[in-house]
Amino acid sequence: MTVASNISTSSKAVKNTVRYQYKSIITKLVQLRKQRKLSQEYIALEIGIETKLLGQWERMIVEPRLFNLLCWCETLQVYLTVSTDDGEF
């Protein structure tokens, strides 16, 4: 196996891991919105986007940019954190 194919395989593994984590975050945000009985319209208005776009985010048709994802979290009063595997940062 060449170095280029090792990098390609590694890159695919990273992308799959990130997609899984991303899906997990979106799923939790949707669950929180529903548990709190908040409408998509309310969340979209707070973020400053169209309701249709929030629906696309929730169905994972379109991925929100990091800024919008953070605004979504802020609206639900939850926060994303950054950490390392060893717990140090």
Residues covered by each model-derived region:
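A short, Lys/Arg-rich alpha-helix, primarily the initiator
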Residues: 2-35
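Short basic helix-loop element that most often maps to the first helix and adjoining turn
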Residues: 27-46, 71
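Conserved hydrophobic/aromatic packing and binding residues within compact polymer-binding modules
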Residues: 29, 43-44, 54-57, 83
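Short amphipathic recognition helices of helix-turn-helix/homeodomain-type DNA-binding modules
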Residues: 83-89
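DNA major-groove recognition helix of helix-turn-helix/homeodomain DNA-binding modules
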Residues: 65-82
